[in-house]
Structure formats: C-alpha cells, structure tokens
Regions:
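Cytochrome P450
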Residues: 2-44, 96-106, 166-177, 187-213, ...
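N-terminal membrane-proximal hinge/A-helix region immediately C-terminal to the signal-anchor transmembrane segment
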Residues: 2-8, 16-153, 174-185, 271-274, ...
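Conserved cytochrome P450 K-helix E-x-x-R motif and the immediately C-terminal K′/meander segment
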Residues: 69-93, 274-281, 379-425
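Cytochrome P450 heme-thiolate "Cys pocket" and heme-binding signature region
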Residues: 160, 459-493, 519
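Conserved cytochrome P450 catalytic core segment spanning the I/J/K helices
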Residues: 163-165, 239-245, 267-343, 369-387, ...
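Central I-helix of cytochrome P450 enzymes
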Residues: 207, 211, 216, 271, ...
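Cytochrome P450 heme-binding "Cys pocket" and the immediately downstream C-terminal segment
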Residues: 354-356, 433, 486-522
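Conserved cytochrome P450 K-helix/beta-meander segment immediately N-terminal to the heme-binding cysteine loop
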Residues: 405, 435-464
Length: 536
C-alpha cells in the first residue's frame, strides 16, 4: 500500500511539472504569435505582389512600393526596364516608391502627353522645386533648372547671342581650329601606331574645349597632344555623376549625407569646389580684361560670359558672379555632353551598319567633287559651311542615332496644379512627371514595328532631310524650352563626323562592352574603344 506522504509528494511533483510546463508554454506563446504574424504578413505580401504583378505588370509591395523592381533595373539597364514597362502599360505608368521617400512619379512616352506638358500647358509643368533642389549645388539658378522669370531672362539673352553673326562666326572658327589642329592629329597618331583609342573620351575633349571657348572665352586644352588630364574637366564630370545619384536616393538621406559630408555628397562637394574655383577665377580675370578693353575702346569678345557681363538686371545692376557662374556651368553641361555622346553612339551604330557608313561616305565624296577643283599637294581639305549644310543623309543618320540614343534619355517636370493628360492620366498638384525620350525611340506605336532598327531613310523624303515633330522626336526638347543650340549641335556633329569619315574607317574593338551609364546624359559606360584605318 502506498504511503500517503509519498502520494502527496508525487502529487506535488506532478502539479509542479504541469505548472512548469504551463509557464513554459506561456513564455513561448508570444514568440509563436510573432512567428504566426510574420508568416501571415509574408503570405499577404506574396499574394499582394502576385496580384499587382498580374494587374499592372509590375510588383507593388506594401510600404516599399516598386523599389525592388527599380533596384534590379539599376543593376542592369534602367532605360530598357522603363521601356519594357511603358510598352506593357500603353505608354504611361505611375511609379510608386517607398511611402517615406520622394520616389513617386508618373512616367510617360506618349507624344500627346509630351505636347501637353511641353507646349499646351507649359506654365503648368515647370522644372519644379524637387528638380531644382536636387541639382541646385551643381546648376544653381542656370537655364536648365530655372523657372519663370529667371529662366525667361536667361533664355532671351542667350537666344539673341546664339543667333548673332559674331557668335556664329566664333563657333565656325573655333570648330575648324579644334578639329584640324587637335582632333585629326590625335586620330592620325592612333592610326599610325595602330593603338586603340577611346573615341568617346576624345569627342568629349573636343566638345569640352569647344564649349569652353564659346561659354567662357577660354581654351582648357583637353584635346592637346597626349590628352592631358584637365582638373576642371575631371571635376565637372565627377560633379555631374554625383548629382545624378541624388535622383535615386531619398531626399532626406542625401541631405543627411551632405550635412555629415559623407559618401557621394563628399565627392560632390570636393568636385564642386574645383568647378567653382575655376569658374570664379575666369570671371574675375574677364572683368579685368573688359575694364582694359573699355579703357582702350576695343570690343573684340563675343563669348557667352562676356555678353552676360555687359547686361544689367531689372535694377540696372551688373549680374552677380554666382549668376554668371551658373549660366556658364549650365551651357558647358549642354554643349559638352550632348554632341559628343551622340557622336559616340553614332559611330558605334555605323560599325554595326556598314551600308549606312558607305552611303555617308559616298555623299561626302560627291559634295567634295562638286567643288570642281583638285586638292593642292599638302593642303588639308576643310569642309565649308555650305557643304556641311548639303550633307542631308549624314543629318538623317545622326538624327536616327539620336532617336535611338538621345543624349538626355529622360527629363523631369513637376505639375503645379491638378491636370489630366490627353491619355486620361490624372495628375495631382505636386506630381513629378518623367518623360522618357529613350523609350520613345523604341515604341512601335510611335515609330512602327522597325522602331529598334537603325534606318536613316525614315528621315528622308525624295532624298531630302525632313524633321519630325518635337513631341515625337524629343532629343532637342520641345515647346518654349526647345534647345537653343540645336542648329549649332547639328553643325558641330556633321562637321566633326564628316571630317573623320572622309579620312578614316572607324572600327570598334572586338568584344568591347557597350552599355549606357546612369548619368544626366547618356554616356557609354565603358567608353568606345576603336581602331582607325586610312581610307583610299
């Protein structure tokens, strides 16, 4: 028979064990609940993502929106990703970033929408505070980021200068000097030594020297023999690259990094210090030169900086050094990158389409033959302005390159009042709008089923070049902000391209990687390594 005391002891032990187990279960209950919540949340997010993917062609995640898709695109080719989404969504889609960021916008490639925002409702779609704040450190209040009266004032003065006889003469003279005294000797040296050369780098140096002559009235010498490293040119490129990173970084984060002087913001600050030092030194020197010219009664300069120095603001006061700096930096950005980058893609496309190159060379030779005079021994052939104008097929080939690879692949606006696009997209006040020029060149609805093919003939009517609507072909923008330097850019590209193609066949190095770089303008990420052979 069991002892009662033993029974009590056993009962007590069992009770203690049960209580202990109960308390242990209670302790792990919160962990189990947390696990259940996490599992349920994960299932919800997965189902939500699948539904959104089927519905919109792009996953929209709770809290973080479409950020994962954007990050994947940034690792590969963001421009092709945008094009794919636009094609799937009929030409317009709303990008939803994380709820706590500024990465919310409407992206469009519909020509009707572009005409609406660039012309019809121009005043309702300024660059806006978001764009201005993002590029302020680099571009200041220059023409690319300015709105309203500040923009109109610069636009009017620059327009008068661009159409003046003095400026046109300066552009033609400086281009002849740079192409024949620097560009061609650099290429000939590479040919003689059979050395591959980065043509994009060479062209960037050409246009940088050219635009600095026009904007500042100085020659930085980037294209001199040996291709020297020019601190200002290097700093300018660093600053533009660092600025573009802000557009894919939440505003609060890049501003915090700027305050702490860390990461990309430190790089931007250091490069801008060199840019500003160069610009302000040039401005100070020019002021002294103009004082001497006024004292002697001479007036020989026609560069952009000098023109604005002689103007007065609304209070009849000279413009500030900061204002002058902003103007020149903006025009250098426009003049340096756009033409050179376009030419780099143009030569790459010719390498892939030799039949187009043959037609261009035939056109150039025919125009030279029309001179009716033989070249003198040792005299270098220099194309005349009227001959460059006759190069219609070359202009078509350059336009086709710009259609597929626009120098500015995307641009930005911000709506200041509630609007509705012609395609029915509703825009609330403050909405950021991205118009994708790169994608427009790859839309069957705009250019037909052969939109991805390189066909200069689509620009010709009975052998004559015919331009397209600025809202279909937006490489030079449209409406009141149509590029002031469009005619100069075409002349510069045609003169440089014809001077090269008349003398050399340009071959891209085998297996050279080609990809666009994420930047304000459409650089080739790895440059364009080429070799040159003399034409017969």
């Amino acid at each position: 028979m069991q002892n009662p005391s033993n029974m009590n002891s056993t009962t007590t032990t069992s009770t203690s064990t049960m209580l202990s187990s109960g308390f242990s279960f209670l302790r792990i209950m919160p962990e189990l609940q947390t696990l259940e919540i996490l599992l349920a949340t994960s299932i919800f997010i997965a189902i939500h993502s699948i539904r959104q993917s089927k519905k919109q062609g792009l996953a929209v995640w709770p809290f973080i929106g479409m950020l994962p898709s954007l990050l994947l695109a940034l690792r590969h080719d963001m421009y092709e990703w945008i094009t794919k989404v636009l094609n799937e969504r009929g030409g317009t889609f709303a990008f939803k970033g994380p709820w706590f960021t500024n990465l919310q916008c409407v992206v469009t490639s519909d020509p009707r929408n572009l005409e609406h925002l660039l012309k019809t409702k121009f005043t309702s779609f300024p660059k806006g505070p978001y764009f201005r704040n993002t590029v302020q450190d680099l571009l200041g209040d220059g023409i690319f980021s300015a709105d309203d009266e500040t923009w109109r004032k610069q636009r009017k003065a620059a327009s008068l200068e661009f159409h003046s006889a003095e400026f046109r003469s300066l552009t033609a003279r400086s281009l002849v000097e740079l192409v024949h005294s620097r560009l061609l000797p650099v290429l000939e040296s590479a040919r003689q030594t059979n050395t591959p050369v980065d043509l994009q780098d060479v062209l960037l140096r050409l246009t940088f020297d050219n635009v600095c002559m026009l904007a500042f009235g100085i020659d930085p010498g980037c294209l001199r023999p040996g291709l020297p490293d020019i601190p200002f040119a290097h700093a300018f490129e660093e600053a533009t690259e660092a600025t573009i990173i802000r557009f894919v970084t939440p505003t609060a984060i890049w501003k915090a990094l700027r305050f702490a002087d860390l990461s990309n913001e430190r790089r931007l600050r250091r490069s801008l210090r060199q840019v500003d030092e160069f610009a302000y030194n040039v401005i100070d020197t020019r002021k002294k030169e103009l004082q001497l010219e006024e004292a002697s009664g001479t007036n020989t300069r026609s560069d952009l900086l000098t023109v604005f120095m002689r103007l007065r603001d609304e209070n009849d006061q000279p413009y500030s050094d900061k204002f002058l700096r902003d103007i020149c930096v903006n025009f250098i950005l426009a003049g340096r990158d756009t033409s050179s980058v376009a030419l780099a893609w143009f030569f790459w496309l010719l390498n892939k389409n030799p039949e187009v190159e043959a037609k261009i060379v035939d056109e150039i030779r025919r125009i030279v033959k029309e001179r009716g005079e033989s070249e003198k021994e040792g005299e270098e052939l220099i194309f005349r302005p009227e001959e460059v104008k006759k190069m219609e097929y070359l202009q078509a080939a350059l336009s086709e390159a710009l259609r597929l690879y626009p120098s500015v692949p995307v641009d930005h606006k911000e709506v200041v009042e509630d609007e509705v696009f012609p395609d029915g997209t509703v825009l609330k006040k403050g909405t950021k709008v991205i118009y994708a020029m790169y994608s427009m060149g790859r839309m069957e609805s705009i250019w037909g089923k052969d939109c991805r093919e390189y066909k200069p003939e689509r620009w010709l009517r009975d052998g004559r070049f015919m331009s397209e609507s600025a809202y279909k072909f937006t490489a030079f923008n449209g409406g009141p902000r149509l590029c002031l330097g469009k005619d100069f850019a075409y002349y510069q590209m045609k003169f440089a391209a014809s001077s090269i193609l008349y003398r050399y066949h340009v071959k891209v190095v085998d297996k050279h990687p080609i990809a666009p770089k994420l930047a304000l303008t459409m650089y080739m990420k790895y440059g364009l390594k080429v070799t040159l052979t003399k034409r017969d």
